């Protein structure tokens, strides 16, 4: 039976410790900060991205992983005797999956998987793939299983401000201003089709919003697997995280 390597896009947003524990190789997206081109999670941190946005008033620009980068990764592992399962960010949010599929053409033992998700939603699939590989499941079967699992993911997040959505062209300036004046914190829900939409709207300071949001996600949900709950945060004050 062939050895199996699990790889993923950096948009899975797992910690370095988790990538190491599950032996997952991460391919970074390119991030452009003005004239500086960086690689997500390699030579630029999340904190630097927020600092850049605050100081310049503009958002960093991201670029999908190139076909060539995918080819280099896939070929390196297949030539070493591995089958590869790669977990991509939703095809509705990036060209990464399309590029990975192009790179995998002609490689019968490479299986790109469209997670139909982002961030730790995709990360959940990458970890599950690593667990199945460790149990001896074939790469093709792992990919098929992930295609089933992705439909059961329950992923959402709440925003402190609409400022960055406005700068990214995803909402109007009037909507952003109104939400900020009313202290509205929208919940963004990822559908099992790989798109995002607005869910509940919360009002008040961020500490109250986060606690209300978490309660709202868990109450009445009897399909939660405790060992699979992930709380992902960014640019969040530590005192709120600790609660």
Regions found by a protein language model. Name each.
Residues 56-58, 64-91, 95-99, 143, ...:
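Glycine-rich phosphate- or other oxyanion-binding loops that anchor nucleotides, phosphorylated ligands
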Residues 53-54, 78, 133, 166:
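Hydrophobic residues in alpha-helical segments
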Residues 64, 115-116:
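Short beta->alpha junction loops
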Residues 61, 86, 112, 230-231:
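Short catalytic-loop micro-motif centered on adjacent basic/acidic residues
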Residues 53-56, 81-86, 104-115:
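Glycine/charged-rich beta-loop-alpha catalytic/anionic-binding loops adjacent to active sites
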